[in-house]
Amino acid sequence: MLLVSALLLQSATAFSPVSSHVAHGSALPVHRQPSSLAMSTTPTATTQPTDSSDADLAKEPTNEISPSYDSVVVGGGPAGLLSAIMLAQRDSKQKIAVFDRLPAPPSPTDEKVWQQTDRYYLIGLGHRGQKALDRFGVWDEVKAVSAPVVGRKDWQPGAKAEEGVERLAADKPTTTQVLPRDKLVGVLYKHIMDNYADQVELNYEYQVMPTSFGNDADDDSATDDNDAASAVTLTVSKCSPVDGTSTTPTPEAECEVDTYQTVTTEFLIGADGAARGIANAMEEKDVERRSKQNAFQKLFGGIKPFKVKRFEDDNKRVYKTVPVKVPSDWRFDLNYSARSKGSRITFEALPADDQGTYCALLLMKEDDELAQPNSDPKKLRQFFDEEFLQFGPLVDDETMALVAEKPASNLPAFRYAGPRINEGSATVLLGDAIHTVKPYYGLGANTALEDVSVLADSLEESPTLKDGVYSFSDKRAGEANALVTISRNMDRPGKLFLVTFLLPLILDGIFHKLAPFLFAPNMFALFQKEGMSFRYMQARKRFDRVAQLSILGCVFYGMVVAAKSMVKIIAKKLGQSDGMVGAAMVVGAFLLSLAKKALAGGNESKEQKA
């Protein structure tokens, strides 16, 4: 399995509760009900800065939240923070708040934090992500703490250490830059604190839930043309990390949902990723709305339905992370990849810096003996010695024991939201909240950042916020569907893998080489083309597939007709029936095949003896 860009999930380090924000306005009264706790999880965790120079990333909480904001962003990941930067740049008078359930990110320059390379997601930023970051003036800061990847080096199953094949992406217009996800978040955080601290509040360890999406969304008879007021009402609850979970792949947070503050906003962006708190609330709202509609209203009502399409993971893989320091005579800018015999385990390594520090994934099935927690380190060492000869010497016994001991982590399942990604005229979703894919092809984080750029375009092109919200939904809902559908078709198990991935890859290679003016290159090449939408890729490949199968069908039909004609001619010459001649030709072809195999086997035996 090819991994153009792998996400390397962390086992997050301990972090004491931190909430950092610059307060606007007065503190809200706190609403209290009988105490209860809600558990929430997220695949991101952070580490408290250890150097005093990084204190600006860990300001003491003021616990003061304004009763209203111009805009609220739920989710403090890359897409959420870039959304806040985008909004701040659009209007310097905007009062913006960002809320996230986990602590503030570590400093992007704190080397003590980033030395533990196997504790963090690594993401590869391609042309989509780089273009979005550059548009909002943060790319140079991100690039400064990233490592370039200019190609791959692959080892086929059973290959010796010296038999790796190096492939450089010489014709690739954009060089992929790799860095831990949390480091990217840290860069964006610092950029906000340095440039927009008086405008943007960064509130950590808070959970946000909508109670009203505005009058136009809450009105069950509303249509897209409704111009009713659309302020969104939210409840904000304090959270804290759960003791003992800081070293798990998916750290948890306890949120006091019965002790909350109420906030209103004119514009809500849901960028809370896999948590999907806003998306879940939108889905519940849509179910409630549609339950009150008759059949005619459901079919011809003015509002499109909203649903999160959740696919069953029929090709599930889990992984363990392995820190690796490659030798000084190896290149530090390659993705190193190897597969074991039978494709039992795949080894994928990406650079965590430009000094030869790598973080590797061991991808395997969840029932594999080595995927279990507290597995035998001797068996893991033996597996490396037999299958990954080139990497075994790079992992010492202590690290091998730690890898064997820790539990495996899950890759995300495919999901997308649609056919609209707005609720009323004041709420939109973006990022992983609308499209979740496995990290094999580097599309998740990059597309999430691109969403922010498209949202900026939609707002700039529209006379009102409402028009911008609907424009963004129209542009990106279909993209989310296409992205997830394409990615899932490239990750099917068994025979489906042959039909949906391998065979199309072969056909695209053949036909594009024969007629590049008519047939597009394979999907991997299309991913690298700038300015090409996923919906276009999907439609283009459907056209290619119909044309390819039509041509193959015509060729096959012509071969059958030609064979029948040949049989008739030979039968007429010999005075035999068509069936007799046809059977003789089939038997002859079969015997010729056997003779060819026997001859090849004999030559191989002679070579072995020699």
Where are these regions (language model features)?
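C-terminal helical "tail/cap" subdomain of flavin- and related membrane-associated enzymes
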Residues: 400-401, 441, 457-610
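Conserved FAD-binding catalytic core of PHBH/FMO-like flavoproteins
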Residues: 240-243, 249-254, 258-411, 417-418, ...
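Active-site-adjacent segment of FAD-dependent monooxygenases/related oxidoreductases
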Residues: 107-193
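Conserved mid-domain beta->alpha element of the FAD-binding
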Residues: 73, 78, 84, 270, ...
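A conserved short coil-to-beta-strand element within the FAD-binding core of flavoproteins
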Residues: 204-232, 239-241
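Beta1/beta-strand and adjacent pyrophosphate-binding region of the FAD-binding site
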Residues: 61-79, 97
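Glycine-rich FAD pyrophosphate-binding loop
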Residues: 88-118
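N-terminal chloroplast transit peptides
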Residues: 1-27
